[in-house]
Design a protein with these regions (language model features):
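A structural boundary/capping signal
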Residues: 1-337
């Protein structure tokens, strides 16, 4: 459907399981809706039992249709092209931003405006993933740019997701034109330069920009890795370190050159280990276990030592959680005494 030079695309079906998605090639991932990838990584998190992914995707389809109609009707560009630096594409993005905010409640969640990254914060799935925005609850810089990209791509816009320091923004990225789009603010729309994000929200060094893969347009596999990191953040907040570590490792597998993900794995393993130690009895029997013959993670991306530590912690957690494990644990402690 062509409407005012807009190519309207509706969502494609997708394997709505992130474990299926991590096995896909880059080319295969590029065929999936970014919204579906994001929601697949949200599925199964605390607070998502009522999440209807297909309903969310249909809502985004309907929003895109309304934006296409509004863009066709709008005469702002003809009346004042200088306001948009003579760029019809910048005008189209402005219209999309306005319709999302005014018509569909696209906004930053008030409770998250004063987020302090130096303090422990409890993140909910609805805040870090796009279903919270679709449901009208608001979002943050972890969800607003993703939804913006998802709707824009339905309109045929060449939008990319970009990472800054603890922040995401959007980029119009085509061979003919390139500009940034800041959508996670309360006053509407801005298009800052890359240099702006080198000093905001926090200054970044050239080494951080390189090692953390910042300010580059993300490929589909990097997008998926980002969503798995957000998944890990939610599991971390509810102290399910087993799930958090698993999501972090798969994020690092998808994006091995991003040293930030790798740097987060060992602290999370330490938190998991310390958490289990609190639950253990004072007298601890020796635990022996055999490693499975087949590796859980790609051997060229995750060391055998890390995988062994994960399996060991998982065994201990299983013994502590299962009634039969607790009974066996207590029996062995009595034998040691």
């Amino acid at each position: 459907m062509i409407t005012a030079n807009l190519v309207l695309k509706t969502s494609k079906s997708t394997p709505l399981n992130w474990r299926d998605l991590i096995a896909c090639t880059e080319e295969e991932l590029s065929g999936f809706d970014i919204a579906a990838l994001n929601l697949a990584c949200a599925a199964g998190l605390p607070g998502t039992s009522q999440l209807d992914i297909q309903s969310c995707l249909r809502t985004l389809d309907s929003w895109a249709k309304e934006i296409a109609k509004a863009t066709k009707r709008c005469q702002w560009f003809r009346q004042n092209p200088q306001k948009y630096n003579g760029s019809f594409n910048l005008f189209r993005v402005h219209v999309m931003s306005s319709v999302l905010r005014v018509r569909f409640g696209f906004r930053y969640k008030p409770e998250m405006i004063h987020y302090d990254e130096n303090k422990e914060t409890f993140f909910r799935a609805e805040e870090l993933f796009i279903h919270g925005l679709i449901e009208g609850k608001g979002g943050c810089c972890s969800s607003m740019p993703i939804l913006f990209v998802a709707v824009g791509r339905r309109l045929g816009y060449p939008l990319k997701l970009v990472r800054a320091y603890s922040h995401y923004f959007v980029r119009w990225d085509s061979p003919k034109e390139r500009f940034n789009i800041e959508v996670s603010n309360s006053d509407g729309f801005n298009n800052y330069t890359d240099d702006h994000y080198r000093s905001w929200p926090e200054p970044i060094s050239p080494e951080q920009e390189r090692d953390y893969c910042l300010l580059s347009s993300l490929s589909p596999s990097r997008e998926l890795a980002s969503f798995l990191f957000e998944r890990a953040s939610v599991w971390h907040c509810v102290a399910d370190y087993r799930q958090a570590v698993d999501a972090l490792i798969w994020a690092s597998v998808l994006e091995p050159d991003n040293l930030f993900y790798n740097s987060m794995i060992f602290p999370e393993l330490d938190k998991w280990n310390n958490y289990l130690r609190i639950l253990m009895p004072r007298l601890q029997p020796e635990i022996r276990y055999n490693l499975p013959p087949q590796r859980r993670y790609p051997a060229d991306k995750v060391s055998a030592a890390v995988e062994k530590e994960i399996i060991g912690l998982q065994v201990v957690q299983g013994l502590l959680a299962a009634p039969e494990g607790q009974e066996m644990w207590q029996l062995r402690v009595r034998e040691i005494r």
